Amino acid sequence: MFGRESADLAKKYFESLRKKAADKRFARYEGSAASETPSATGPLLRGGHEELNRGCANAARDGFELAAQPEPRRVTGFQFAVDVSQRFQACIPPVGSLHSCCAASCMFAFAASEALYETLVADSLEAARLKVGAEYKNLANDSGASDGEMAPPRPDSMLGGLRGALDELAFAQYSNADAEAHERVYDGVMAGYSDMICSDEFAQLSDFVFRFAALLKTSFKGTTGAGRGAYYVSPGSNKRRRLNRGNSSRNGYRPREGRLELFQKMILMHATYFAACITLDDESTERMDRYLAEVFNTPLFSSPALHHFKQRTSVFLVPRRHGKTWFLVPLISLLVSCFEGLRIGYTAHLRKATKPVFEEIYARLCRWYGEDRVHQIKGETIAFSFKNGARSSIVFASSQNTNVSIRQLLYGVAAKARCGIDDANGRVSELAFYFCSHGAPLNFLLLSAP
């Protein structure tokens, strides 16, 4: 009910700030002293709490007052707040608390989210690079990427004019007593954010993102012996060498980065969102979605669209030799070596079709981490051991009967992977990818929660 009044108040407040900024620029141009208006942060309405609770919009319109103290205590992190009932407030880091119905809240939320999570992506990739340590050297040698190519600087996602306008905003400051309540709310929100990024589960997610980006730099170099599709070129061929091992000192040539097809990016997004959902707790779901939106460059995905994307089943009709196995081998290898307790099932119509995939994944994991942490059981299961004793596994299965139903095939892999399926209500504790090739039987990949 106060949305329109709050929008009017915010508009009047912005106009007053614009006038003061113009006066300050004019005074600076004339050589006079700088304005004594407090330049630190804070908000806008004081003394309007009771009026807004009673619904007296007319009294609230006259509620503008600047802080009277000449040198108030700086409150770190605050940029905006509205003095209204707590149930009407929304805290947006690193902006602060504002009215949830404020017309400008969308602008603040977008700008703050972009700044916060864009920085988080860069910092998390750098932290993952430092954490990997010796394992990073094996990964870098396998991918052919140098140290500086792992996490290149991201371009600024904001327009220059918008960033300049945000930098020029200066808000009135709260007194110490008024700022304490908003500061507690802000600290509570940021505490949840800090707990997420400091958790071991988020470290697993950031490690996976970093490692996949490193391998994508050179089109998954080293994925030989399996999936010899359109993207496969033998390691000794000149074409492969020109693509990934160009000499940067000669004619300014730089190696070309790998590119994903649309269906490959969708598979990657499905697998990453699923692994993040089963790894992080429910309280971190919204923050995790924002983080992955920055990683996959999908900032315009709405919440309903993202929820539908995570819940739906995807069937990919992909022709032969178009990069299915070329992409799945490094994806499975990274999933099983980054996320603890994950169980993966891979099936094909014939055993000879799963054997090269099994051998390549096993060889890749041994090359990255050594044979002590990788174990194969009866030629159909690969178990990966983490340093803390946790395990993840991959189960390979085949079906000679090409007319077998999807449900029967799913039960077969689930039984070997020892993961249950709730048939009564269709609860999704597994994520399955179905791949159909023209004139070929069905293949699919199954990911199961711990």
Swiss-Prot record:
Domain of life, per lineage: Viruses
One of the GO biological process terms: chromosome organization
Miscellaneous note of the record: The PsHV-1 may encode two large terminase protein homologs UL15a and UL15b. The terminase function was assigned to UL15a since it shares a stronger sequence homology with the other family members.
Similarity comment: family membership: Belongs to the herpesviridae large terminase family.
UniProt name for this protein: Large terminase protein homolog UL15b
Organism: Psittacid herpesvirus 1 (isolate Amazon parrot/-/97-0001/1997)
Record gene name: UL15b
